[in-house]
Amino acid sequence: MSAQGDCEFLVQRARELVPQDLWAAKAWLITARSLYPADFNIQYEMYTIERNAERTATAGRLLYDMFVNFPDQPVVWREISIITSALRNDSQDKQTQFLRSLFETLPGRVQCEMLLKVTEQCFNTLERSEMLLLLLRRFPETVVQHGVGLGEALLEAETIEEQDSPVNCFRKLFVCDVLPLIINNHDVRLPANLLYKYLNKAAEFYINYVTRSTQSENQHQGAQDTSDLMSPSKRSSQKYIIEGLTEKSSHIVDPWERLFKILNVVGMRCEWQMDKGRRSCSDLLHRMKELCRYMNSFDSEAHNNYKNQVLYSTMLVFFKSAFQYVSSIQPSLFQGPNAPSQVPLILLEDVANVYGDVEIDRSKHIHKKRKLAEGREKTMSSDDEECSAKGRNRHIVVSKADLSNSIEVLESFKLARESWELLYSLEFLDKEFTRICLAWKTDTWLWLRIFLTDMIIYQGQYKKAIASLHHLAALQGSLSQPQITGQGTLEHQRALIQLATCHFALGEYRMTCEKVLDLMCYMVLPIQDGGKPQEEPSKVKPKCRKGLDLKLLPCTSKAIMPYCLHLMLACFKLRAFTDSRDDMALGHVIVLLQQEWPRGENLFLKAISKICQQGNFQYENFFSYVTNIDMLEEFAYLRTQEGGKIHLELLPNQGMLIKHHTVTRGITKGVKEDFRLAMERQVSRCGENLMAVLHRFCINEKILLLQTLT
């Protein structure tokens, strides 16, 4: 028998004995190895027995022997590959844990050599990178030799693979795993331009990761709650996983914290003016403002370093603060469907003074109802005009019930605005920030466009805000799936109301009304308590009420519809009380003044005064939409001798009725009777839901309302 045949016989005999007598099988193999020490099959069989018996130490020694003596055997590398895969695996099963323990028994030098050789045999870029990363973590001394090369390979692979998003497996491994190893190892020498390149890549990744829902998941409008027209959009319930990575690897804890740590390390390596200890975003921004003031006094190299310090520090404060603001006012953009439902908020001009700026000469027309009104404190007065505070220091009002952390959210909004202003205050910052935004394609970020729109409205640049809102609508259209007919997305409704508030601020009242009436089609009824007076705001009369000239309102029908009615009232009020006569506008004002009655009583008295001066009044929609008992009594009184016998044409087609009654019952008798009966019927309607009446008014009379403002 040949030597090869002898070896095969001994191995086969040992295999047969394993199930019956393990020790006998091992004795056969020990004898065989003594006789044929250069035979690989004998060594491998011994290793297999020890591995299957899960004897870590013995199996480790045998694996080491095979690695040293038979480095070219494919079976050895297959075995090593299985073990290194277990090292990268998150699984905690028994077999995986055994393989990890087996690897730990090997000498460190052998572990390092194994990992390097396995890496060389990997043809898949991602797998090769993970293996090399395993090496760098276990043997930090290898970072100097392999760290930068691995980082560049990952960035190159990202380019070659033409990844659509910065949030991909290659960038994740580079930013979260490789980059910290490189920049925290002071033996790795990195030029400043390479550090800035890496910081840029990290910032792009983390910001896109935090805000990924905006780009990666389509928004669509689901079934709406009857009490909430503009409820948060529903999204797919599947968890976010980066393609090529496991769910665990895809999850990043405290991404903002990680990003600012990278900023600090890069800053120290680039010799920025750093402060010891952690600084808040507010402190950091304040420091950057100070640095900008005396930056030009440094030499050219330091000057260049500090310019980059201001750029990247301010930029990160801006994106973080803007994100914190938007994620608070519209959390549905970033939260999964299982998160608690939160109503979005929308920034609007405050038109709470719509009932103000009224001076009434009560001596001209006194009635019992108006006498009662004399005792009531006016909600607004004309001197409030002096308190206007437009521009940089405008106030934003938000209810604690709508936003529990309102102080923090408004602070984030302030920091984001100030960061934005600083980034555009110097030519270098403007140029570099614009370049970065173009490279990152920030113009496609829906969440950022929402912030920018609110910022422009805050600044009072309403024409720019209108352009931004059209950009927002186009952007939303490109990201959304086709909508169900008759349903508007949250962003579409947000755009309508913000367009309305901007057109109003510009004095474009017909456009204001048009947007409001379009929005009315989306209102969900019934809205309860909409017609009750809001006593809370008028309990304490602020000295400068109009200084509070912006509001964050919930995107619900209950909150938005009253605001829309305020806008319409403000539009028609200006036309109704001019020197020229406009009964239609005056009639619309009277209908709209029913909301929040008696807050609008002073304005109603001014309307009555104007009717008295005219001696007559025509508004044929009166009995369709006026159900306020005080108003009905006032108009009934106007018909009496004491009220001035004012001629009122409030019934539909009343002119035709007068002609008809001339023949049959005389000119006035029949009309008076019709008016009395109509008034009695109207009194019986006083219990109707006022918001339903006003909603019907907006829907049914849309054409008439717009014609009045033409």
Swiss-Prot record:
**Signal peptide bounds:** none
Q: Which GO terms describe its biological process?
A: RNA polymerase II transcription initiation surveillance; snRNA processing
Q: Please name the InterPro entries in this protein's record.
A: Int_cplx_su10
Q: Can you say where in the cell this protein is located? A: Nucleus
Please explain the role this protein plays, according to its UniProt record: Component of the integrator complex, a multiprotein complex that terminates RNA polymerase II (Pol II) transcription in the promoter-proximal region of genes.
Assembly and interactions? Component of the Integrator complex, composed of core subunits INTS1, INTS2, INTS3, INTS4, INTS5, INTS6, INTS7, INTS8, INTS9/RC74, INTS10, INTS11/CPSF3L, INTS12, INTS13, INTS14 and INTS15. The core complex associates with protein phosphatase 2A subunits PPP2CA and PPP2R1A, to form the Integrator-PP2A (INTAC) complex. INTS10 is part of the tail subcomplex, composed of INTS10, INTS13, INTS14 and INTS15.
Describe the family membership recorded for this protein in Swiss-Prot or TrEMBL.
Belongs to the Integrator subunit 10 family.
According to UniProt, the name of this protein is Integrator complex subunit 10
What organism does this protein naturally occur in?
Mus musculus (Mouse)
